[in-house]
Amino acid sequence: MSARKRVKRASAYDLYRTCKQAGTCPPDVIPKVEGDTIADKILKFGGLAIYLGGLGIGTWSTGRVAAGGSPRYTPLRTAGSTSSLASIGSRAVTAGTRPSIGAGIPLDTLETLGALRPGVYEDTVLPEAPAIVTPDAVPADSGLDALSIGTDSSTETLITLLEPEGPEDIAVLELQPLDRPTWQVSNAVHQSSAYHAPLQLQSSIAETSGLENIFVGGSGLGDTGGENIELTYFGSPRTSTPRSIASKSRGILNWFSKRYYTQVPTEDPEVFSSQTFANPLYEAEPAVLKGPSGRVGLSQVYKPDTLTTRSGTEVGPQLHVRYSLSTIHEDVEAIPYTVDENTQGLAFVPLHEEQAGFEEIELDDFSETHRLLPQNTSSTPVGSGVRRSLIPTQEFSATRPTGVVTYGSPDTYSASPVTDPDSTSPSLVIDDTTTTPIIIIDGHTVDLYSSNYTLHPSLLRKRKKRKHA
């Protein structure tokens, strides 16, 4: 079975006409038609306190009135709707009258005209009066002078020419151009394949406007009475790093907020050696001022070591320490600068003096004993069989001059070291039996009982890790 189609209920106004008298209206129909909903009540009572303009909200404007109810708002009619006096009946409607509200019978009133197209114009006149008002007396027509109009129905038209009255002489006025100054007009003609500006000649009689491109330019005539003032930018920085030092405003407006210090003269310039600032932003630039004594000096606000709390607050006065410089008396005799005749003069050495001849002495002499180049080259067989190969080896023959280093007394050692007879290096003999043995490694002496050497890490004793139980 198919579901029943839900039928839309009739509008509230259609239900109100049939169910009001029978008393079977739904609960939402009567308040909506009679304008007694919650929204209507809010507008009705709120309109007493506020002004809502000419909207008719809360002012009980005239509309369709139901029996026993209040007026409602009437919407505009559809486009093309008209209303006339005939739809009202034989009742006469005059300005300033309102239709009476009957009890129990709905009344039809004059509705508004269409919103899109106006209807028939309605005028408040009486039905008994004529629609067209004619004047009591009609003025006589004097007609046209010297003009006849034919009223014949034939195709021929009679035309009567008006003859001029007076002499037949006709005055001919010659138009002469006025004496005007000559104007200079510059014409800019653009010779283009797409557009050619037409060139017209200037005329002072007929049309003066043309299609020329007129450019007006030049300088002013006479003295303009002005002055050239350079443009100045206000508020813009003049340097890459603007220097704005915040100045203290304390004590300027309030006299009691000024801070006073006790000035203490000092003769120790070391007081100014250690300068510390809590906030360098408020420190002014160094200034040279003249004191009461007339001498220039150094001054600084100094806070001596006083009581200090646990929070770091220092309790105690601040002193203004001043160090005045010494005064140069006027009676001091100036010592003249004199040069003693016995003073030894200065010797001037010319920089561009010609160089004298000098002898070149070689610091090193190359001989056979210093040769480290290989003398003989031989080959050593490596491997066996097919893989046997010969590797060239070089035999070096080099000698190095060495000296004799002897420790202790020369009589202690019976054997003497072998030395090179051609060596010119001196022998070093240390005649001291208490000298600690020294080992020479690559020409550097190493003391066995001192700490001037470092062993290789492989020779150091390794530490064993302790095992924790």
From Swiss-Prot:
Composition skew (Low complexity), residue ranges: 414-429
Top-level taxon in the UniProt lineage: Viruses
GO MF annotations in UniProt: DNA binding; SNARE binding; structural molecule activity
Main subcellular localisation: virion
Cell compartment(s), UniProt: Virion; Host nucleus; Host early endosome; Host Golgi apparatus
PTM description: Highly phosphorylated.
Stretches for region Disordered: 401-429
GO cellular component: host cell; host cell endoplasmic reticulum membrane; host cell Golgi apparatus; host cell late endosome membrane; host cell nucleus; viral capsid
Signal peptide interval: none
InterPro entries according to UniProt: Late_L2
Disulfide bridge map: 19-25
Similarity comment: family membership: Belongs to the papillomaviridae L2 protein family.
Function, in words: Minor protein of the capsid that localizes along the inner surface of the virion, within the central cavities beneath the L1 pentamers. Plays a role in capsid stabilization through interaction with the major capsid protein L1. Once the virion enters the host cell, L2 escorts the genomic DNA into the nucleus by promoting escape from the endosomal compartments and traffic through the host Golgi network.
Subunit structure: Interacts with major capsid protein L1. Interacts with E2; this interaction inhibits E2 transcriptional activity but not the DNA replication function E2. Interacts with host GADD45GIP1. Interacts with host HSPA8; this interaction is required for L2 nuclear translocation. Interacts with host importins KPNB2 and KPNB3. Forms a complex with importin alpha2-beta1 heterodimers via interaction with the importin alpha2 adapter. Interacts with host DYNLT1; this interaction is essential for virus intracellular transport during entry.
Protein name: Minor capsid protein L2
Taxon lineage: Viruses, Monodnaviria, Shotokuvirae, Cossaviricota, Papovaviricetes
Name of the encoding gene: L2
